[in-house]
Every structure is written in C-alpha cells, then in structure tokens.
Amino acid sequence: MLYQIHEWQRSLLGPLSYFAEANARMLSAPGNPFAQFPGVPRLAAGNELVYRLGKEYEKPEFGIHVASAHDQEIAVIERVAMARPFCQLKRFKRFSDDPATIEKMKNDPVVLVVAPLSGHHATLLRDTVRTLLRDHKVYITDWVDARMVPASEGTFGLDDYVAYVEDFIRHIGAESLHVISVCQPTVPVLAAVSLMAARGEPTPRSLTMMGGPIDPRRSPTSVDNLATQQPLSWFKGNVIHTVPPNYPGRGREVYPGFLQHAGFIAMNPGRHMSSHWDFYQDLLRGDQEDAEAHRKFYDEYNAVLDMPARFYLDTIEKVFQQFLLPRGLWDVAGERVDPGAIRRSALLTIEGELDDISGLGQTEAAHDLCSSIPAKRRAHRVIEGAGHYGIFSGRRWRETVYPQVRDFIRQFDQPAKAAALVRRTGDAPAAA
C-alpha cells in the first residue's frame, strides 16, 4: 500500500514540479526583458529548486561517446553483449582511425566491472568506466530496475546474482579477463570465482575488490549495525512492498528505490540541505558552472532503482547477519563457497581510509579467505583521505587509485597474452 500511496503522491506533485520548471525557464530566459527586475532572479531560482526537489528522476545514460585511449581521442559505442531479465552485460566498444592506436587497443586487457545492485544505477560508475577505457576493453553489469521486470520472470536472489556473474565471466572468457567489483558485489563475485575454481573451470586473471563487505564484522559501520540491530522479520515487514499496477513488474515484491533514497538522505541530511541552499545561491549569483555540477550530481544521486526483495533479504541475512562467507558456511545452489579453491587469479583489495559504508579491514579480509593465492600475487591498498565513493569516482580515483589498478592488471595480464599466442601459432614466445 505504501508504494501505491507514493505513486499517488508523485502523480499529484508531478504537475506542480513541471509548472515550476516552466516558470524557472521563462523567468530566467535570456530574451525575457523582466529577467533582471528586482526579485525575479529569486523567483526563478526558487522555482528551479522546487522543480528539482519534486521531479521524477529517470535512469541516466552512461553518455560515453568519446574517450581518451593511449593519448588519442577515440569514439565509443555502448553495446549490449548479453541480456538477462535482471541485468544487461554492456560493452563499451572503442573505435579509432589511427592504426597505431588500434594496434595498442587490440592488446589492451579485458575488464569486467561488476556494479552494485544496491539502489543506484550502474551509471554511478560512469567515471570508473571512462577512466578504464584509457587502457582497457571494458564491460559492465547494468542491473535492471526490478519494477520493470515482469513477475513472470520469477524471483531473483543472491544465488542468482552469483550465477549471473559466472555466466558473464564465461561469456567474455575467463582466461583473458580481469574482474573489478565495487562495494556490494565483492561478495557474490568472490563466491562466483570460488565456485568456478572448485569445479576446475578457468578463472579470471585478476580480481580487484573495492570497498566491499567481505567480512562486515571488521570495523562495523552504521550500515552494518543497522543490519544487525533488527531481525530479518523487521526488514520483511517494514521495507518490502509490492510494485503497483502501473509498472511491468506489477505484483513483484521489492525494496523500493524511494525508500532507499530516503535512507541515503537520512545518512547525511545536513549535507544535502546545505548543497541545495548552495545551489539556490549559485543560481542567484549566475554561477552556472557550479549550478550545473549540482544538477549533474543529483540527477545521478536521485535516480534510484527497486531491488528484488529476495536479493535484498538474502544480502541482509547471509552477508550482514550470518556472515556466511567469512565463516566458511555459505552454500550457493547446494555448492559450498570456498575461496581457498582460487589459485590462479591474482587479488587486489582497495579500501578508503574514511569509508563510512564498508569499514577498514572488511575488504582486506578476502586475503585471509583466498589462502591458496601466493603472496606475490596479492596486494592491498588503503587510499588516504578517501571515502567510499572516492575510491571509484572523482579526482582521487583518477589520479591515485586508477594507476594502481591499471598497473596491477598489467602485471598479471601478460601470461594470458602469452598463452593466447601459443594457441594461435603453436610456438612459445622467445625468452627475454
């Protein structure tokens, strides 16, 4: 019923919001002779603020059409490499008319970025993707808003997430692949690769795990504490709701995006209020650069998706309440998850010093679990001054984190290239 009430509220506020947008555009239009009259700039700024606070935020586009690779500008086309009901595997295909750049790009490592299914869309990793395109062939998991998936497609739980990751790795080809998991998916990615290793399947050349809850018992944050302070029944009764009839997924049980968004705001309400006030002041001053930066940030931040109820509850129970992975007690579709089975994949873990979502040590715990990976094939980094988002987006990601990720991938990519050469020619490369 709460979801339906939210939809009614949205339908009532929608016309007011778009009326405010029209007023803001009219009052601030360059050709409007009254635009600079006393009080008019305040009216225009106030109307735009009302519009942005009340509008419906659609899923943003990645919008990566041009990028830089090997110091050259290249064209990028976004393609769907594999489609599943709850996720699209997307590839960002690079193109160049420079022969030298083409040759370099052919030899670039292949990277799969596994994005979180945790409220925001995969486009939150736009900066991650754009930066990786400099030196890599890039794929990403683009999770589908659960309210858009017909109930006839069935449920989707944590085990299904693991199975999806396995399928994507096989589709791309594990032997030449490097997997980067950001935040929440570090857990299912580690499970997927562990299961593949235990079965004797090829595993990715390297695993880079960034800011994820491998062992939430270490340095628990407010997010971790929330999951342990309430029983699973509380989450079932308070945050799980049914998709209303006006969506393709009508009747599906979900953790609604609007509730998740309320939770995001509640974590730092003062910061968001201050940001909106600053936006209003920027509009009054005519500071369009800062105002546009605010628009872009909140266009992404306010665009949320519904999570499948089963997946959300599985994550709460198995990851944050029972700690099944670090305790060695997690079974996926009847198979025990044993990270000790991973031997060939290199492992890099990255944590932000100031991360208030995944505390220090939680991601590093992967090294204790992956006991069969030799020490020379493992590395751990703590990024000074970085919060949760800083390890995969923004200046600190581009200037500090990315070079370390790139170098680690390059270090362990060469054996795959040598093996590929042997398969093509039948000859081993000459020793250096």
Regions found by a protein language model. Name each.
Residues 63-149:
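Short, surface-exposed "cap/lid" segments of acyl-processing enzymes
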Residues 320-339:
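Active-site nucleophile elbow and catalytic-triad environment of alpha/beta-hydrolase enzymes
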Residues 1-45, 174, 192-310:
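Alpha/beta-hydrolase-fold enzymes
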Residues 383-399:
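Catalytic histidine-centered segment of alpha/beta-hydrolase-like enzymes
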Residues 180-186, 352:
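Conserved alpha/beta-hydrolase "nucleophile elbow" surrounding the catalytic nucleophile
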Residues 342-343, 348-351, 355:
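Short beta-strand/loop motif that positions the catalytic acidic residue
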Residues 148-150, 160-177, 189-194:
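Conserved acidic catalytic loop of the alpha/beta-hydrolase fold
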Residues 356-362:
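Conserved alpha/beta-hydrolase "acid-adjacent" motif
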